[in-house]
């Protein structure tokens, strides 16, 4: 989860200055476009269903599009077959997307073009600093290589930060303030091993797809500061943001593939969807057992409200964990 020292909620929920109003001051498109962008490092689990369902319901409640993108830019972390199982799970749970699925592994040319543009504008540079050096500095890069004019060989590429984002507005959490060191940091946009950085690929693809609002888990609050800065330096409209509470395991840790969260079951999707709606504190139909999947989701769309969503994460219901584990063999 995001450390309080890095990102903090404002005690005053009003925006204090233009820096925190950056998303809302951008263009206001007529069409809502949301998205769900999982990485194929494992199967979907209850925690990722929360993010998928929340983004889906928000998009459909606005009468907008809901896109799906597979973020497969880190081959060492990918699990064979996970991408197709993720898509199958979304369909099984009734979360049908609009348009074709985009795979980041097929978008390298766009990322290279963006890197070239940033270089031509003097907005990037090569860096050879190691993780251990940055760790010794307290975790934030200090700009050591900024004016060293290093060659490309064996170096990462960093964004030359010109528009630091000290605060941004989240529709659920209100005004969020970033640690100045995080806001001012020249972050990596291409890794030393040649792989494109997550923040670069996300911004390039969201801009390409015309995404107007990003609904995702609260574990991604910290990268939002960097992504908004990159949007601005690339002169792209900045989307609005909603960061949902995280589903936690019994130890209080985020449900994740790294923490061995069980995959979603292949049985009747409605009980798990009901658990997800309860987690988000959404209104439920009185006799949901009598509704088919389509009608259940339609009810959820028609009654979707951000006001009810809790601000903090919560332990996943035991029955949900047991149900997922008992159905593991079906996946």
Curated annotation (Swiss-Prot):
Record InterPro entries: Glu-Q_tRNA(Asp)_Synthase, Glu/Gln-tRNA-synth, Glu/Gln-tRNA-synth_Ib_cat-dom, GluQ/Sye, Rossmann-like_a/b/a_fold
Per the annotation, the residue ranges of the short sequence motif 'HIGH' region are 38-48
Q: What class of enzyme is it?
A: ligase
Q: What is its EC number?
A: 6.1.1.-
Motif 'KMSKS' region per UniProt: ranges: 254-258
Q: Name one GO molecular function term.
A: ATP binding
Which of this chain's residues are annotated to bind Zn(2+)? 127, 129, 141, 145
Disulphide connectivity of cysteines? none
Span list, region Disordered: 1-36
Described purpose of this protein according to its UniProt entry: Catalyzes the tRNA-independent activation of glutamate in presence of ATP and the subsequent transfer of glutamate onto a tRNA(Asp). Glutamate is transferred on the 2-amino-5-(4,5-dihydroxy-2-cyclopenten-1-yl) moiety of the queuosine in the wobble position of the QUC anticodon.
Q: Which PANTHER family match?
A: GLUTAMATE--TRNA LIGASE, GLUTAMYL-Q TRNA(ASP) SYNTHETASE
Protein name, please?
A: Glutamyl-Q tRNA(Asp) synthetase
Source organism of the structure = Yersinia pseudotuberculosis serotype I (strain IP32953)
